[in-house]
């Protein structure tokens, strides 16, 4: 258990930032499996007392807090926010980590997430995932601008804050993914009436077509370095979907699969030497792996049901997927070498799993019934801690960003 009292602020404005920072940090931990947040009503020291005299550790041990986070906030004359924090082990009465950040006041939420990541790393030994964003398709049903259903490219923080749409809905968009440096989003769009792959430049909002390939262009995925993109194309083979790879430097295209079955939804291993994909070449949709030159195609899943939408964990240890079994959709995980699969969810329609950058949490879309809208959810690898990420519209096709420094 961890205690997260409000940070200290010497005046009302600083105290407001101090309370807001602590609230974001506390919510991050409350929504993360390794942590249990001690209720603030049990705290025996105020932020001012903590700032003036430091922690009275027996008081914190008495409310079963193993870890204690304290901090302070100060505003500078040029609109900067100075944030200082300390994390203590209440049993040893020792400071575990402490740090000072200075940032423009506009970015106070980001600092709250950075502090959360610092503490997550210190207490679990693994990287955090709080200073991240989630891109997805925001879907508006009904009449807007004289149109029916509209699909927009939208992004938000991992806790649903700072929500914004990047496209106006005039063109259908699908399958968005961040590139590793967070400067671009790759996605499929019908901007000119044809399904083509585009980049959206995050700083400028400019959209650029990647390549005008004949037929269907879909499911683009970057490798971990951002130097290659795997995609599904139907060009030149009678409309049959195959996996291709594009070198982003030279823009050269290489075909990887050669089969009359439907091959789609590629996802790179973290090392970039293998790809997992979906194919019905065995009679029904299953998952396969191959080397990135197209060799050594190996079937991964043999269970009952149909498998879709594979996503290789950034840790390399698991592959997430969608499984449809007897009319029920599941999010599951499996070892890249095969073996026993684990199903984490079940619903009318669970779809599009992607990983947090630490490889320990998944985000996916869920439609609970035929008449329900689609929403975004996260779940950890235990299959517990399922939580909804609120969005103002229907939301599908999510993808997690890398950690934002």
What label would you give each PLM region?
Residues 1-56, 69-75:
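Short beta-strand->alpha-helix linker/helix-N-cap micro-motif
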Residues 51-118:
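Amphipathic beta-strand/beta-sheet edge segments enriched in Tyr/Trp
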Residues 91, 157-161, 201-205, 247-251, ...:
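Short loop/turn segments that connect beta-strands within beta-propeller blades
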Residues 127, 139-152, 168-171, 188-197, ...:
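A flexible loop/linker signature enriched in serine peptidases of the S9 family
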Residues 132, 181-183, 225-227, 271-273, ...:
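Short coil/turn segments that connect the beta-strands within blades of beta-propeller domains
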Residues 162-167, 206-211, 252-257, 296-301, ...:
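A short beta-strand motif characteristic of beta-propeller blades
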Residues 374-405:
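Blade-level signature of beta-propeller repeat domains, shared across WD40, Kelch, NHL, RCC1
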């Amino acid at each position: 258990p961890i205690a997260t009292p409000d940070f200290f602020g010497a005046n009302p404005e600083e105290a407001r930032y101090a309370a807001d920072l602590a609230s974001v940090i506390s919510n991050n931990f409350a929504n993360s499996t390794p942590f249990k947040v001690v209720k603030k009503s049990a705290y025996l020291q105020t932020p001012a007392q903590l700032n003036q005299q430091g922690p009275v550790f027996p008081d914190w041990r008495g409310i079963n807090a193993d870890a204690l986070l304290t901090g302070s906030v100060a505003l500078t004359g040029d609109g900067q926010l100075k944030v200082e924090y300390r994390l203590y082990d209440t049993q040893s009465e020792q400071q575990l980590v402490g740090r000072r950040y200075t940032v423009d006041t506009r970015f106070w939420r980001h600092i709250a997430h950075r502090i959360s990541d610092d503490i997550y790393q210190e207490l679990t030994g693994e990287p955090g995932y709080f200073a991240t964003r989630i891109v997805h398709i925001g879907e508006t049903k009904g009449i807007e601008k004289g149109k029916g259903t509209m699909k927009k490219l939208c992004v938000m923080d991992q806790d649903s804050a700072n929500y914004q749409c990047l496209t106006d809905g005039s063109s259908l968009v699908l399958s968005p993914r961040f590139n590793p440096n967070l400067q671009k989003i790759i996605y499929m769009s019908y901007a000119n009436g044809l399904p083509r792959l585009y980049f959206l430049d995050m700083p400028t909002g400019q959209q650029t077509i990647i390549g005008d390939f004949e037929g269907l262009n879909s499911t683009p995925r970057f490798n971990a370095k951002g130097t290659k993109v795997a995609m599904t194309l139907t060009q030149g083979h009678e409309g049959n979907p195959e996996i291709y790879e594009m070198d982003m430097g030279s823009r050269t295209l290489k075909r990887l699969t050669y089969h009359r079955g439907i091959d789609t939804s590629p996802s790179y291993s973290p090392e970039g030497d293998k790809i997992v994909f979906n194919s019905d070449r065995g009679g029904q949709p299953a998952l396969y792996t191959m080397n990135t030159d197209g060799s050594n195609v190996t079937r991964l899943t043999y269970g009952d049901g149909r498998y879709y939408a594979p996503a290789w964990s950034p840790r390399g240890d698991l592959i997430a997927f969608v499984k449809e079994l007897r009319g029920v959709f599941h999010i599951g995980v499996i070892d890249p070498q095969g073996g026993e699969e684990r199903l984490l969810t079940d619903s009318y329609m669970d779809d599009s799993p992607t990983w947090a950058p630490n490889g320990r949490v998944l985000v996916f879309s869920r439609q609970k019934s035929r008449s329900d809208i689609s929403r975004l959810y996260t779940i950890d690898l235990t299959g517990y801690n399922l939580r909804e990420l609120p969005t103002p519209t229907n939301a599908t096709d999510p993808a997690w960003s890398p950690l934002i420094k």
